[in-house]
Amino acid sequence: MLKHQIKITINAIKKIKKLLLKKKNFKLKLRIFITGGGCSGFQYGFELEKITKKNDISIIQSGIEIIIDPISIQYLLGGKIDYIENLEGSKFVISNPNAKRTCGCGLSFSI
């Protein structure tokens, strides 16, 4: 099962639930995707969406749904999705064992 191959922390789940509450729509799903860009070649993206596309992989945990396209999922397997708040701000963070290198800001990576 994919939910065991991609870990979602309690902090990430709590933040997603807060975002859904703010939008007043618990049917929304968090899409996580990888695009080209950033200083290391690839970067993560996050969006709330209503619709799951035909080939999306769906991970349901603690009442929230995360959707990932089939190309991005191969680069995220074994990873951990977290949400952190510190003096620099707050953000979703992905610990990705597939990344060969990450940039200093942690927003982009290379494979």
Curated annotation (Swiss-Prot):
Oligomer and partners: Homodimer.
Function (record text): Required for insertion of 4Fe-4S clusters for at least IspG.
UniProt GO molecular function: 2 iron, 2 sulfur cluster binding; 4 iron, 4 sulfur cluster binding; iron ion binding
Alphabetical list of Pfam families matching this protein: Fe-S_biosyn
SUPFAM superfamilies named in the record: HesB-like domain
Source organism: Buchnera aphidicola subsp. Cinara cedri (strain Cc)
Name this protein carries in UniProt: Iron-sulfur cluster insertion protein ErpA
Coiled-coil ranges per UniProt: none
Domain of life, source organism: Bacteria
Cofactor: iron-sulfur cluster
Cofactor binding annotation: Binds 1 iron-sulfur cluster per subunit.
Entry keyword Iron-sulfur: yes
UniProt keyword list: Iron, Iron-sulfur, Metal-binding
Signal peptide location: none
